Design a protein with these regions (language model features):
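Glycine/threonine-rich phosphate-binding loop and adjacent beta-strand/alpha-helix elements that clamp
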Residues: 1-217
Length: 217
């Protein structure tokens, strides 16, 4: 069967004090809705300086499971982490992220990566996804859905669940030059100012397919 019938689709909400840059920032991943009505995080996406691909379902020496700590120190990557788990957590099935976003680009990309943070703070990628958001100019935050690759992974006791949000994953995915032109036709790139909202009205979150443990009783 797929997905598993006993799957409990569980939303984990992103939250911060307005600075989710880098693991040392205030980005949090929680089961409760964010409380701050004006909360958001922002970053600048420059297509000339894309986030380099580090692991994932691609070819080459950087494919597969890869340490993410260097990527997470970039100023154009937002990082949200849970508390250390008190018991193992299995995630098996499809994964989606619902983000409420604003941008000043006519077209841009949004990327989400699910990460397992070990007790020594080493971070490893689990799966990721990307969405090309065209006709993106809006005055109010717009909901988007980023579909990540399905996975089957157990986060062990003492580990933390983390997601990274950015606007590029190159060269695995082609850069969006933020111009609205296709990759074939584009000749000029534009810098995009990106904003992610996490409020009671705009509760950005990732939905994990949690598999409850089977009791031995």
């Amino acid at each position: 069967e797929w997905p598993l019938r006993r799957t409990q689709y569980t939303p984990y909400y992103i939250d911060s004090a307005g600075d989710a840059h880098r693991p040392a920032g205030s980005g949090r991943l929680t089961l409760g809705l964010p409380a701050d009505a004006g909360a958001s995080d922002a970053f600048v996406y420059n297509p000339k300086q894309p986030v380099p691909s580090a692991g994932g379902a691609m070819l080459g020496p950087r494919a597969g499971v890869y340490i993410q700590n260097e990527i997470e120190e970039r100023s154009d990557v937002l990082v949200y982490s849970s508390q250390a788990l008190e018991e193992p957590l299995e995630t098996t099935g499809p994964i989606t992220a619902v983000l409420y976003v604003k941008t000043d680009a006519v077209s841009t990309d949004w990327t989400v990566k699910l990460v397992d943070v070990h007790p020594d703070s080493t971070a490893y990628n689990i799966c990721d996804g990307i969405l090309r958001h065209s006709y993106a100019l809006e005055r109010t935050p717009q909901p988007i859905k980023v579909v990540l690759w399905p996975t089957s992974h157990v986060f062990l006791t003492g580990h933390r669940i983390r997601i990274e949000i950015s606007s590029s994953n190159f060269p695995r995915y082609d850069r969006n030059l933020n111009s609205g032109d296709t990759s074939v036709d584009a000749t000029v790139s534009h810098i995009a100012h990106q904003q992610i909202y996490h409020t009671p009205r705009y509760p950005s979150h990732i939905v994990l397919p949690v598999i409850p443990a089977i009791s031995n009783r």
